[in-house]
Amino acid sequence: MAEMKSPTKAEPASPAEAPQGDRRSLLEHSREFLDFFWDIAKPDQETRLRATEKLLEYLRTRPSDSEMKYALKRLITGLGVGREAARPCYSLALAQLLQSFEDIQLCDILGQIQEKYNLQAMNKAMMRPTLFANLFGVLALFQSGRLVKDKEALMKCVRLLKILSHHYNHLQGQPVKALVDILSEVPESMFQEILPKVLKGDMKVILSSPKYLELFLLARQRVPAELESLVGSVDLFSEDNIPSLVNILKVAANSVKKEQKLPDVALNLLRLALQENKFERFWKEVLEEGLLKKPSYTSSYMCFRLLGASLPLLSDEQLQLVMRGDLIRHFGEHMVVSKSQNPLRFIPEISAYVGTFLEGCQDDPKRQFTVMVAFTAITNQGLPVMPTFWRVTRFLNTEALQNYVTWLRDMFLQPDLDSLVDFSTANQKRVQVASLNVPERTVFRLRKWIIHRLVSLVDHLHLEKDEAVVEQIARFCLFHAFFKTKKATPQIPETKQHFSFPLEDGNRGVIVSAFFSLLQTLSVKFRQTPDLAENGKPWTYRLVQLADMLLKHNRNVANVTPLTAQQRQAWDQMMSTLKELEAQSSETRAIAFQHLLLLVGLHLFKSPAESCDVLGDIQTCIKKSMEQNLRRSRSRAKASQEPVWVEVMVEILLSLLAQPSNLMRQVVRSVFGHVCSHLTPRGLQLILAVLNPETNEDEEDNVVVTDTDEKQLKHGEDADSDSEDSKNSESDVDSEDGEESEEEDRDKDVDPGFRQQLMEVLQAGNALGGEEEEEEELGDEAMMALDQNLASLFAEQKMRIQARHEEKNKLQKEKQLRRDFQIRALDLIEVLVTKQPEHPLILELLEPLLNIIQRSMRSRGSTKQEQDLLHKTARIFMHHLCRARHYCHEVEPGAEALHAQVERLVQQAGNQADASVALYYFNASLYLLRVLKGNTTKRYQDGQKLEGADIKSEPKDSEVQTTSCLDLDFVTRVYSASLESLLTKRNSPLTIPMFLDLFSRYPVICKNLLPIVVQHVAGSSRPRHQAQACLLLQKALSARELRVCFEDPEWEQLISQVLGKTTQTLQTLGEAQSKGEHQRELSILELLNTVFRIVNHEKLSVDLTAFLGMLQGKQQKLQQNLQQGNHSSGSSRLYDLYWQAMNLLGVQRPKSEKKNVKDIPSDSQSPISTKRKKKGFLPETKKRKKLKSEGTTSEKKAASQQDAVTEGAMPAATGKDQPPSTGKKRRKRVKANTPSQVNGVTVAKSPAPNNPTLSPSTPPAKTPKVQKKKEKLSQVNGSTPVSPVEPESKKHQKALSTKEVKRRSSQSALPKKRARLSLVSRSPSLLQSGIRKRRVARRRVQTP
């Protein structure tokens, strides 16, 4: 331990002679020093580094040889600890220590390591730790950065690593790898000297291990002349060495299986092949014909990683060789076969390699373009294997991106199938289908992928830099989605583009869906500002202008779906309306209308018949909206005439919401946010009709939820892109599921009609055989006829089951679409509540939203869409509606209806089966109260400046009624009925927090409801309801807002009523038998404590003497229940509440009594204690009997009597004025109940600690004064103190004999004495010697 001591302190001769402060500081320094080594071995890297830094700082600031030696010893020992994860931590710490203290010799450290972990003396059990300790020791010396400068230590480490390399079973190739790392940094002269010692001249040895080959490649790179003199001229890529290289690469691939990285030897071989111009032989013969001849997944992944790592090293010709060989086809097959959930999928790694390559050659667009085209050309029957959304495209520079987009466009128009590296999987080759091998299918799959890749490119573009590319892609998609060329013209470049394969309808549908996806990307990613886009126009507007220009060139361009005259007229009117809106472009509402028009106008080309009518209605609504905006200054004389255009607009927006388009959903939200201020009741009912389940079920056909062709196309794309393996597996699973569902349907609903038909067929078969030959077998003709009839019957039944199953799936799908449409329709409700919280129509949303919540809560275990609908509705209702800062103020005409709605909501809350649903209804009623009350609550809160009785009282009830629409009497009756329901019904959905929220918001209502609560505190109510009433009353009385509503006499009268009710319940305190009764006792004491605090704080003239006597009479019962373990989970809480009440009445809980409550042993013969014994305790019969002390001297008796007088004469004192402990608690506890005699005079015993009382002169509600210390000393010296008055029920305790008290005191003192002896036995020798001397002296005195 001398090494662990701080060098700043002189080493003490012994612990006894060291001062206390010096010994403490020495221990602290030692503990701090030792903690460093514990933290170094922890798995958290930050903790290890922090501990290492602190250790180095500690050693720098306290330079001491002993601590340095100990640190080195601990770190060297840690190199071979049993926990393998800690060995590298100690190695790194040792390296940093050697790096910081360069005066430490490396040879000495290496010698200590070899001495601690001797390779010659190790046994079998210590072999692995010894080997790793030597290896990590060498690594520590190398990581310190000083090994290459110390030749002697370097040679020793090389020899040690050479010895360790023979233990391959434990260390694998780590020693040779460490040797390669060391030699890669040594000077060339030293390398030449070490090389003959570590590398033999035999090529068989070199080609036997990846590490030896890596050492050979390192020597060939650094000292080729010395290597040639040692090995000779070697052609590593000769025909003879190719098999050995293949085997070495296989071993290297298996060695990095867990690390999932490229072996260094493979990359070094690639560099050597490039250097010697033998790359083609290496790639074809070693990789493609060697490793991939019978590939394993480790060899395949090594080849894939080598492909990615070789990209920056290859020339254009070599890139063409690599990207069109067998390896790239094997890579493509892996991409197709591996699933997205497969952890071995290689797409993240190849993306990292390609991204690094593209980022590194930003100034070479040709190489970027070549690599992108090469990876795009890897196709499986025409479908490229790379994902359409590939993040590496963001590294393309402008020229490479433009060339790549041009190549994609040309491949879409005139596919060059010969330039593709196409392949088929094993299953595709096995299952040869003639329809799948035609060029048309290959072109269809290729074009579908290309159009999605073009759209995905826009996500990675910067508009400022690549605006031309974005416009080129958008024009291409728009033209080929909706138009076709009649005659080429130079004004439209797209007309010069010709297809080598005709564009099929399937491809055109893909282009249409991709075009609207592109609109979504452009609207979200590129939100135009005037300084970014041409003339500050959004992309949608520019595309509409392009479409208008194409429509005008009808000689050169034709629509794919021709427009009628009416549809063309609707388009022209839209363009004129856009010009009108353009003049008002500064208004946000005009911008929203413009965006809606543009989007619906583009949908005119997709579905002309549907969009034409919608387009006309939108224009009509926009014009009427603008006209009403101009006439806004007029009077509201025509306010009763509802603006029909708003209702039409709502219908339009609802129909647009039915389309599964996120872009359309955003536009609808934006437009509705600008028109919702003009919303009418009829318009709101149109929205609520979608959300209302009753009308929605009956009118399902009113709003058609479209399941667009986008999903079907996506499904077809997935079906085409999947491999045959997935097809087969999915078909098997589907067939199994179909069989199981059919069996379930057959078992679940047996058709009686089918059973009757089956019986008729069987009877007809029997009749065909003849009535007289019933017991004989049927003939062949009869059997054939019976089989045919049965087969047709079962076929019909199977068709009926299949039809029912399809009908069930159809209904389920329709239900999902309907729920999804309702979720979208909630967007309009959310916009209305957020944008117009003061709109009168907001009040009509309460009950419809509550109906949705109630219905969804009833079916909460259903689909995810039901859950989403519930969560969104609840969020809108609670956060945006009930908790909104603003609300409607114009409710005077409908105040009576609102009061009726409050009553209805409160009654519905009380009738719910679920408390969570009742909470929503109750909060809705509170929201209506807030609306009815208006701004009066805010005015009262502004006047609340003071506390207690000095606060100005709130205005009277009549004032409240005159300043707001709230009918206080009516509301009081409503909530009093619900409060009665809470405090009387057995299972009420109403809860205490609901009424606490009501009381805190509306204290005037709370004042009117308090008599009901006080009435249920006692009486014939259930104990649980009484406990709820006490809790509600306690929280209400503590509220500051309630006190403002009471005058001082009213408040004092209320407190007296509460105390009178609690007196009835206190009669049974401590006699609880059930859980509800016990909860009532806890609640009544908490209420009493609150009332006592109010009385003391406000100094109310309330007499509490009766409560003092009543509580003192219950003390013994409560203490007995606590000792016996009755209701053990809450007895201590009840006892604490009791003493809190006594403390508020002026009686302090004695400290000694509080200790005795925990230390009193339970009686083993008690019937309650024998019911259930605690685990881990011996029974009474197995315990050793305690020895009784018999020889007690008179001196000991006198001392105990004097201590008893000291404690017994001491009155109750408050905690803050209590004198500090003198260290004699044990003797005071033992002798507390002993009658004291001083000089032969018996001193009157003070009240027992269990029964503290007040003197007659002390006021009942005030704490008695604390006696001073000198008075206590005078009592000890012989003066007789004045004994306070004790209750009659407690005087029987004075009849206890002195003998019994002595016996109990001696028995209770024995365990504590033994505990103290055990503590002494663990104390230092100095303390033990002093205690031993005092113990011997005491024995001598006690011996007669």
UniProtKB/Swiss-Prot annotation:
UniProt feature, compositional bias: Acidic residues: 731-746
Region entry Disordered, spans: 1-24, 696-752, 1150-1344
UniProt keywords, alphabetically: Acetylation, Activator, Biological rhythms, Citrullination, Cytoplasm, Isopeptide bond, Nucleus, Phosphoprotein, Repressor, Ribosome biogenesis, Transcription, Transcription regulation, Ubl conjugation
Comp. bias regions, Low complexity: 1247-1256, 1317-1329
Basic residues bias (residue ranges): 1170-1187, 1301-1316, 1331-1344
Biased composition (Basic and acidic residues): 708-730, 1150-1161
Record carries keyword Heme: no
Subcellular locations according to the entry: Nucleus; Nucleus, Nucleolus; Cytoplasm
Annotated region described as Interaction with MYB, given as residue ranges: 2-580
Any Gene Ontology biological process: regulation of G1 to G0 transition
Motif (Nuclear export signal 2): 261-279
One GO cellular component term noted in the UniProt record for this chain: cytoplasm
Known function: May activate or repress transcription via interactions with sequence specific DNA-binding proteins. Repression may be mediated at least in part by histone deacetylase activity (HDAC activity). Acts as a corepressor and in concert with CRY1, represses the transcription of the core circadian clock component PER2. Preferentially binds to dimethylated histone H3 'Lys-9' (H3K9me2) on the PER2 promoter. Has a role in rRNA biogenesis together with PWP1.
Subunit structure: Binds to and represses JUN and MYB via the leucine zipper regions present in these proteins. Also binds to and represses PPARGC1A: this interaction is abrogated when PPARGC1A is phosphorylated by MAPK1/ERK. Binds to and stimulates transcription by AHR. Binds to KPNA2. Component of the B-WICH complex, at least composed of SMARCA5/SNF2H, BAZ1B/WSTF, SF3B1, DEK, MYO1C, ERCC6, MYBBP1A and DDX21. Interacts with CLOCK and CRY1.
Protein's name in the database: Myb-binding protein 1A
Organism: Rattus norvegicus
